[in-house]
A protein has these predicted regions:
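Hydrophobic core segments of alpha-helical transmembrane domains
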Residues: 72-77, 128-132, 178-190
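N-terminal topogenic module of multi-pass integral membrane proteins
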Residues: 1-87, 91
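Short juxtamembrane and helix-loop transition motifs at transmembrane-helix boundaries
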Residues: 46-58, 77-86, 104-115, 135-140, ...
Length: 193
């Protein structure tokens, strides 16, 4: 009970959410994950000349192959869930369904299945369960919530910019900068904090 009270000081879970609503939200997240997995592999296997010029210039195909967008989507799912357990469940199902869409497309449309990568990403999907549980507290109050949200934004900042000042400060990818800015808006603090 002491631990529960400690965590509820950071952020209290919503208790008045019906089971039907939770199921519908989780099913929607599963569908979104599956569609994004198929889209990511489709765009990965599509020649860049097929894509509109703006998507080619933004390097959208490689963007979905890097970590920043997936960290942001997991963070969004986590912080907008009703409780840390729902955050963990929803994020886990998002990644598992995304991997299902990705590797089903790989196997049945493109005709190959990279098992080593698949196993690695499944292990990461299982780890996302625990990370999302912790991430849910990023929208809470106090020093722990500030620390968690700072870690998330720091990881996304490192995806967007070279932070090694001996090599000079420069931007890696424009879309990662946008992703980082979205995370800053998503996890912004009250002025007093």
């Amino acid at each position: 009970m002491i631990i529960k009270a400690f965590f509820e000081q950071i952020r209290k879970p919503s208790k008045n959410v019906s089971l039907n609503r939770q199921i519908v939200i989780t099913l929607g997240i599963i569908l979104l994950g599956f569609l994004l997995g198929v889209f990511q592999k489709w765009i990965d296997g599509t020649g860049s000349s097929i894509l509109p010029m703006i998507l080619q210039q933004l390097d959208i195909g490689n963007y979905f192959g890097r970590l920043a967008i997936w960290i942001l989507l997991a963070t969004i799912i986590s912080v907008y869930s009703e409780s840390p357990l729902r955050a963990a469940i929803n994020t886990f199902f998002f990644f598992i369904s995304m991997l299902a869409g990705y590797y089903l497309y790989c196997n049945y449309i493109l005709g190959f299945l990279p098992r080593t990568y698949m196993i690695m990403w499944i292990v990461i999907a299982f780890a996302s369960f625990f990370m999302a549980y912790i991430c849910w507290y990023a929208k809470g109050e106090g020093i722990i919530a500030i620390f968690i949200s700072s870690m998330i934004m720091g990881v996304l900042l490192a995806q967007a910019f070279n932070l090694n000042f001996t090599q000079g400060f420069y931007m890696y990818y424009f879309l990662e900068v946008i992703t980082w800015l979205i995370s800053v808006m998503l996890l912004r603090r009250k002025p007093k904090e």
